[in-house]
Regions:
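Stable alpha-helical elements in mature extracytoplasmic
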Residues: 113-116, 173, 219-226
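Long amphipathic alpha-helical coiled-coil segments
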Residues: 185-186
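A cross-kingdom marker for long, charged
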Residues: 191-268
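Short, composition-biased local secondary-structure segments
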Residues: 1-9, 189-197
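Preference for long, solvent-exposed alpha-helical segments and helix-linker "stalks"
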Residues: 2-154, 161-168, 176, 180-182
Length: 268
């Protein structure tokens, strides 16, 4: 949408708005963005936006698997509850028994993934925004000051798996998850991040250098081959773009120029 605004391409803008609403975006998400809000106001598109939302949102709601959504929400809440209790609280204040608490949480997250989450993925596909609800990811501003540090998606299953792979694990689910990438249910970046956690905390050495990274140059060729297989850029190119983006974002913040295409969800 932002690119359509920059290019002043009304046809493309309406097309992206329709696609966005069909994927779960709300009108307020558009007007929260200063660049898009100005374009809507300038071209008096408010009625068109609201009309398109009424039509497309019905299609979106019909596409949601509410039973799966409810189950994933419950699993995420269960994981979060016990992670906070055992890892973030008890293991911090009672460090002498840290190993006991880590093992206790390990048994809980293992049950959540092995017994509940994996069968759901096998049956329905990876539960992300494509088949369950899309969420606003970020902290909403409590003041009149605009907040640009947000994104959209559904990261609940992702977080569960990151917690799961923070312990030593084998490769039992690697192919299942990779197949979900090829099916379009799981973003390559998320799969690569999960595998990086597995590589960091297990004896398995199959880094993608998406989240955790190895500095061993002898492994770079194999890493980029794995990245290419799932549609990711070489990690060196990704890192260069990230650093270039950081520089641009810093300049935008210092100049307080927010009416530009956002490079990252945290880039105001």
């Amino acid at each position: 949408m932002q690119i359509a605004v920059i290019e002043n391409d009304m046809l493309f803008f309406k097309k992206t708005v329709k696609k966005g609403f069909e994927r779960g975006l709300l009108p307020e998400y558009l007007t929260n963005d200063s660049l898009i809000r100005s374009y809507i106001s300038k071209n008096k598109l408010e009625k068109i936006i609201n009309s398109e939302f009424e039509i497309s949102n019905k299609k979106y709601k019909k596409s949601i698997n509410y039973k799966l959504l409810d189950t994933i929400n419950k699993l995420a809440n269960l994981d979060n509850k016990w992670k906070i209790y055992y890892l973030d609280s008890l293991s911090t204040y009672d460090s002498k028994n840290k190993d006991i608490y880590w093992k206790k949480y390990d048994s809980i997250i293992s049950d959540i993934v092995d017994v509940k989450l994996i069968p759901l993925i096998t049956k329905y596909g990876f539960p992300e925004e494509r088949n369950i609800d899309l969420n606003y990811l970020g902290i909403k501003s409590l003041s009149n000051k605009p907040n640009y540090n947000y994104s959209f998606g559904n990261n609940k299953a992702k977080l569960i798996l990151l917690h799961y792979y923070s312990y030593p694990r084998d490769k039992s689910y690697n192919q299942l998850l990779k197949n979900e990438v090829f099916k379009g249910n799981l973003q390559p970046e998320i799969y690569a991040s999960i595998m990086d956690f597995q590589s960091k905390f297990s004896i398995i050495d199959e880094y993608y250098n998406e989240w955790h990274q190895t500095d061993d140059t002898t492994k770079f060729e194999a890493i980029n081959k794995r990245r290419l297989e799932i549609g990711l850029l070489p990690f060196e190119e990704k890192n260069l773009k990230f650093k270039r983006g950081q520089k641009i974002c810093k300049e935008k913040r210092e100049n307080k120029n927010f009416k530009q295409v956002r490079l990252f969800y945290w880039c105001g």
